[in-house]
């Protein structure tokens, strides 16, 4: 049996009851389980900035991930308001080294970005920045950017792609937002972003299907594998992004594959728009994977004044890989 995995499972079960109970840290014995934690934690963890991010850091420490992927990893607003910070007032991204250290991570890197919504990866392991992706003008702009990183765990190199696609119903930079939304311009633009990201990461590598790759982020798109829940028309453009991934890459949708026929929302409402994909060699090493609904993350509370949520409008995803 995998003793560290058992300890983690027991601790995670306890954490589901109450965040204050349990400890998901690894044992002191050699641990060959790579734990990856992803979360769009909303506006640079806006909800916990006034607390010095201490609640957030304590929550991360309980899960003891080896690698974290954060969407919306920059401070944007003043605490508990929707008033924008001046650039010099923003704690993140400049101080990610300090925040990561609070939960035991030594390394961090940022993806390419054009606006206030970058992704950041933090790790116990050295991070190689393969590429920072922002797309190309005029019509292949990757709005929130993306990143291709690489870490080595137990002698095995793992490629990590991070992303956060365009969120609106209308296309990026459209002149007529109403007309664009009526033509599903946002869905079509997200497809362009996904094509660009994949073609400049996993599709560039001839034998990527034999390597360890994962791709995580806020896709702002639904998958037709969840249509048993949505019950939309088969040609619905909201499926375009994940149709492309499923039909053109070797990626496997981890949550869908491990929980066939089930629906696991990743936002405060009822939509699954956050995903972690991985290639078969990595998928075969999964020992645990789930959307994290614990005492800290479940039932996000909307702040009526700002329309933001405590702690976030999204839920995290955690995956364990046995890397012996």
Regions found by a protein language model. Give the residues of each.
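Structured beta-strand-rich core segments of catalytic domains in phosphoester-bond hydrolases
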Residues: 73-169
């Amino acid at each position: 049996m995998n003793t560290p995995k058992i300890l983690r499972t027991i601790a995670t079960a306890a954490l589901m009851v109450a965040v204050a109970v349990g400890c998901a840290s690894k044992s002191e014995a050699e641990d060959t389980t790579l734990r990856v934690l992803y979360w769009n934690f909303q506006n640079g963890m806006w909800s916990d900035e006034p607390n010095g991010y201490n609640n957030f850091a304590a929550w991360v420490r309980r899960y003891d991930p080896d690698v974290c992927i954060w969407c919306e990893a920059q401070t944007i607003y003043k605490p508990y308001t929707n008033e924008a910070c001046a650039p010099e007032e923003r704690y993140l991204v400049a101080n990610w080294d300090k925040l990561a250290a609070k939960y035991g991570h030594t390394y961090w890197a940022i993806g390419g970005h054009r606006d206030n919504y970058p992704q950041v990866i933090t790790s116990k392991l050295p991070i190689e920045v393969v590429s920072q992706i922002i797309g190309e003008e005029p019509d292949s702009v990757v709005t929130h950017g993306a990143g291709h990183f690489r870490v080595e765990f137990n002698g095995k190199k793992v490629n990590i792609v991070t992303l956060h696609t365009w969120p609106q119903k209308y296309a990026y930079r459209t002149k007529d937002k109403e007309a664009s939304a009526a033509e599903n311009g946002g869905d079509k633009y997200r497809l362009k972003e996904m094509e660009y990201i994949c073609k400049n990461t996993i599709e560039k590598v001839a034998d990527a299907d034999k390597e360890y790759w994962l791709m995580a982020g806020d896709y702002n798109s639904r998958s037709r594998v969840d249509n048993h829940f949505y019950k939309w028309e088969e040609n619905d453009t909201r499926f375009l992004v994940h149709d492309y991934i499923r039909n053109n890459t070797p990626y496997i949708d981890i949550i869908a594959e491990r929980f066939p026929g089930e629906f696991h929302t990743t936002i405060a409402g009822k939509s699954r728009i956050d995903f972690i994909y991985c290639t078969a060699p990595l998928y075969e090493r999964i020992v645990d994977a789930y959307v994290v609904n614990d005492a800290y993350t479940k039932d996000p509370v909307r702040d009526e004044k700002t329309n933001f949520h405590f702690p976030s409008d999204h839920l995290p995803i955690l995956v364990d890989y046995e890397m012996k």
